[in-house]
């Protein structure tokens, strides 16, 4: 989280209130160099970007020059170069988590707010010291850990409820009285 004099209690990060022109400049400064670096360090991205003039990707409009990698192709790419299709710039075993998603797709995960979800939870009103009840699954998919890590980043304690065991979950909810629920609307309806 970046903080400076313009930081206020409404925004989690000063990036949210940054002048749009400054943000655009910051986002695209050295963008082509970053893409080139990723392409050099990642076999998967090197294959995908091999016919793209990376030095020409310097502003938002240039993003249309990049090929789209469809989710339906990701499984095939990953099978040809396990675990993550060569689409990371560090060794696959260096990540803290290896998630599996439907369609035989594997996703890396790391500690902290790896998915940058803290901004969303903060915008929803979550603050340091809140007790959060997280009913997203912690089994194979990333949602449970994704939300827990984001809430922890803000300074919240998390009850990792997951799904199922409704009777036990109701006991926990009644005893702990969390200030936030994270999960699907359908499971919330069951709990209510």
Regions found by a protein language model. Give the residues of each.
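Conserved AMP-binding loop of ANL adenylate-forming enzymes
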Residues: 118, 122-158
